[in-house]
């Protein structure tokens, strides 16, 4: 429901004004989302945080298409809570409890060896698809909100830019920078980066040298495979 909803709902919003799509057909799709997707997205996942963030992305995109303010606001609330329990800043101190952590944050975070700015709940699980999917979905949700006039980005700029730069450094160097017992970074790359870079660098003017280097040397030239809801970022947000 998360990955599919995060694709279907934005596509439906783009197609809403298509003259060949009758109003009753739009209403049928809205009803399908309410019937099939709402129950699946209604509560926070107790799995790892990338799953919940994907659900939040879908939830907010569907809320826009369905013109459902209550669902949209619930998505924002979930986004804010998960952001603080998934993306770490040293200034946070203790990580807040979250559904699924088993009352053991150290184990839930796969036993980091250093709690540093930009660490994620799944950095030490793998900083391949799990951690990259998580930040991709979180940023997609923030972008949905941005286009509805709600700025989720600015209040969490330190948190998200730290995550981008740490993860990009790890992926560029192949070295986890001492954050995990296994110091070898993933070689898997996904189209996770352009939306965040576009906002924080192009809109806000924040320097993100490692993120830029990763995008320019690894992401754009190699066209990472599209997977689930990570598919379109360079096309829509690279600013070509």
Residues covered by each model-derived region:
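Aromatic-lined, polymer-binding surfaces characteristic
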Residues: 1-148
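CBM-like carbohydrate-recognition segments
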Residues: 152-240
């Amino acid at each position: 429901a998360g990955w599919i909803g995060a694709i279907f709902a934005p596509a439906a919003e783009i197609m809403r004004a298509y003259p060949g799509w009758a109003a009753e057909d739009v209403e049928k799709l809205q009803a399908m989302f309410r019937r099939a997707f709402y129950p699946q997205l209604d509560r926070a996942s107790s799995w790892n945080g990338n799953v919940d963030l994907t659900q939040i992305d879908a939830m907010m995109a569907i809320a826009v298409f369905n013109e459902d303010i209550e669902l949209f606001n619930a998505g924002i609330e979930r986004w804010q809570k998960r952001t603080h329990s998934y993306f770490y800043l040293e200034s946070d101190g203790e990580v807040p409890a979250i559904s699924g952590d088993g009352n053991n944050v150290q184990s839930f975070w796969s036993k980091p060896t250093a709690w540093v700015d930009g660490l994620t709940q799944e950095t030490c699980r793998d900083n391949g698809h799990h951690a990259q999917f998580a930040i991709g979905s979180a940023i997609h949700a923030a972008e949905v909100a941005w286009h509805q006039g709600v700025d989720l980005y600015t209040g969490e700029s330190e948190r998200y830019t730290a995550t981008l730069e740490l993860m990009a450094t790890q992926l560029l160097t192949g070295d986890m920078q001492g954050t995990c017992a296994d110091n070898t970074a993933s070689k898997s790359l996904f189209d996770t980066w352009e939306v965040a870079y576009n906002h924080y660098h192009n809109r806000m003017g924040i320097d993100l040298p490692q993120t830029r280097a990763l995008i320019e040397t690894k992401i754009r030239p190699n066209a990472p495979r599209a997977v689930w809801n990570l598919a379109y970022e360079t096309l829509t947000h690279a600013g070509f």
